[in-house]
């Protein structure tokens, strides 16, 4: 699956100087406006419908007619002609009327009384601490009816928080209307518009690059939207990203309940999307088990095997009660696959469908498993295997099912056997061809048996030998000198038949076991599971690549094995296992002092330098994280797990993919949201690694302060206040080996690496120079993810060891890893 130009690099939010700002001594009054530095947006007072009521709002500058994108006091307008927007004595942004009475406040609990308010070129109104430069409040976290590029909707179940859009009451009344747009917490999430407390329209589940209930989002659709969910921590973020053609654009929830994406082409506003589009799109239009056909007359039909619950109501056009099953299910799903009785339930496939509501995500890895899983579950009424999602199942009524003219998904509906086989006409056609088909099958079976016996007598396991011979020949032709080809029984013996006692760890691609060969050499065996997202081709490419990469800071591949369905990689064994065991364990972290940690940082950097610059192959790792750094007996680091790595050719500097793979928290913003990756993506991951090594804090779980800020925010605040010296792991504070200057410099370098804009990050050669010299370092910009408190967007910053993003169908725009290149 390939995403088309979706979600280009999110432009970082930044502070700007040298232009007017709102301060205690310089308030904004009626008739005066504040412009963003580039002149894209304007903040000021406006009157709606010439009513005399004044609102503080933000709009596109130099665009007519005026488009209001945010309103501060939408619930309480100012009726007088004298009002001021200013900074209060405690640092809040406040609106005062002519009597100095408080009309609106940004709220919060500011920690500084030395603040200013600025309008950024992104359209974000921010309150800035003059001392630290931190944002104390921002309008992007308090949306109205409009989303601008870089804004997001979110939910946070543990903290009972969510960010939504709320419509205006009318086109001229900014007060909250009756429609709310949000993302749902189910997995996968979907967009939902509510009218009051009732569902009004939904987008269908998110499938990685598109909403399944919006057929317009096909391969040609330029999609400015992106979503990341963290099922483990109960958070999700849906973002409106920056595209080349969407810089001047917005998403608006209208007073009528429509969600519109609109962009400006330089002369006119163009509607890019609108939903709901037809009456069929309204939620539950045809009731339970009803099917709303966009092109149908009447629009409502019953799904196959169902009939109207009330014929009279249905004929009169009242479809709300829906349909009921015509023939009861026999539900013999627990029978074996070979059992083919006349009463066995069957599935009827309906194409071009918007998946019904109340779906559940099942853990089956392919369509056949999804089919069989639903068949065995008597409560399963339907299933759909969706590209970009996987297996969706329904265990209750099918509601809000729509049939499109084109696009959509295939819904497999469970029916009684008689619903598909009770037609005499079908039986006649079947009987007419049955005899010929049986004869043909018998002939083919006889031929097959004869060939099988010949093969058995001539040479056993020829097909298996051919397969193994083919991949061995392929590898040998690629100049993989020194690579051993292991037999499966040797690896079974070495690992005690892959005993759980030998298990070292488990990831998205399979399980790693410790083993010992007959000569006493210890090894690590990565055994790919049958449901692994890494297929044979990717497995072969990984072998070809790693076998040609030789460096002291890269894990060495000793050999491989393919035996039937078994695919195994054999690596050198690292006695100290992975880095996370040391820096996050309360006892083992005492074994690595600052000198050792600094040596590990430098070793990882040297390994990256080899991958990015010094090797004859240019490789982007894409999954650099603490658990993928292994340690030998001398605590020297080795970069491991190249299952997601990509090879760059010639002057290629970046690539993009529709299937974002990697681990949240370590993924760069441009990669997590847009699928765009480069060497700078690895640099971002390296920066996160540095901060984890220095602090002993884990990106996935650490939070501090009343706002539950994440590790990047913690590092930024510490560096801003004292150069990051207090970031050192507290267990190292009393150690003589701690070099506070060196550690502070590493914090500085780490912050340079996690800057939001890829172009601002240093390359690995510059990082190595910074680590080995004392030259002055440039000032980093505040990381984007710092601007959201971690409890509100933890889905962007949490590493998911058991929930790594690893989509199987990755149609890459550049070549797969291929050592023959």
Swiss-Prot record:
It is found in: Cell membrane. It comes from Arabidopsis thaliana. This is G-type lectin S-receptor-like serine/threonine-protein kinase At1g61360. ATP binds at residues 504-512, 526. The modification Phosphothreonine is found at residue 657. GO terms for cellular component: plasma membrane. InterPro entries: Bulb-type_lectin_dom, Bulb-type_lectin_dom_sf, Kinase-like_dom_sf, Pan_app, Prot_kinase_dom, Protein_kinase_ATP_BS, S_locus_glycoprot_dom, Ser-Thr/Tyr_kinase_cat_dom. Residues 276-312 form the EGF-like domain. Residues 331-417 form the PAN domain. Its main location: membrane. It is an enzyme of class 2 (transferase). Keywords: ATP-binding, Cell membrane, Disulfide bond, EGF-like domain, Glycoprotein, Kinase, Lectin, Membrane, Nucleotide-binding, Phosphoprotein, Receptor, Serine/threonine-protein kinase, Signal, Transferase, Transmembrane, Transmembrane helix. One of its GO terms (biological process) is recognition of pollen. Glycans are attached at residues 49, 84, 90, 130, 233, 247, 265, 318, 328, 334, 377. The modification Phosphoserine is found at residues 532, 547, 627, 640, 700-701, 807. Disulfide bonds join 280-292, 286-300, 370-391, 374-380. Residues 587-604 are annotated as: CaM-binding. It is a single-pass type I membrane protein. Residues 21-140 form the Bulb-type lectin domain.
